[in-house]
Amino acid sequence: MTAVLWLNLVGLSAEQIGEHTPHLAEWARQGSMAPMGGILPGVTCSAQATLLTGTLPRDHGAVANGWLDRRSMEVGLWRQSNHWVQGEKIYETARRRDPAFRCAKLFWWWNMGAAVDWSITPRPYYPADGRKIPAVYSWPPAYGQDLEQAIGPFPFFDFWGPKAGLPSSRWIAEA
């Protein structure tokens, strides 16, 4: 089986790959880059579910970054369970075709409960007092613990929002 590294680099276009991105430029020169079209809505959860299933939001069900629970009438934002996404994922197809297939799914959405060998994703805790405690979800559970022991805690507040930047990207690359 051929090894594949699939990088989901949101917002990166072919025009931005060059002198300041030497490793990506080398991969592109080797024929390892392919253009992809967008979908609507162009939001994280919908886009990643489309990439993973090859289907549109109307089919996989991830129509936004939030979900309305019709029983409670509450919106849950940024759900991470793989079970929210309907349809066969690319790694499920690969494993069906070759039972020896192995997959690591790092920092994609829909990681929790995904049928992969290793996964890790940001998963903060929100205690009743309103705090946000940075943490990661991983499978197997020791995987995230081992990574944090080896390379330090995940720089959660450098991953999202106004501080998003290189510290989290470096941590993910090291992982």
Locate predicted features.
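Short, structured active-site-proximal loop/turn typified by the sulfatase FGly-forming signature C/S-X-P-X-R
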Residues: 15-59, 104
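An acidic- and aromatic-residue-enriched active-site/binding cleft used to recognize and process polar
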Residues: 11-12, 38, 108-111
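Beta-strand elements within well-structured catalytic alpha/beta cores of enzymes
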Residues: 1-16, 26-27, 51, 94, ...
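A residue-level detector for conformationally permissive "hinge/kink" positions
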Residues: 3, 46, 53, 120-122
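Short, exposed beta-strand "edge-strand" segments with a Pro/Gly-rich flavor and a Y/T-containing core
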Residues: 1-2, 40-43, 83-88
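His/Asp/Glu-rich, glycine-adjacent segments
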Residues: 55-175
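Glycine-/proline-rich flexible loop or hinge segments
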Residues: 4-9, 29-34, 44-48, 66-79
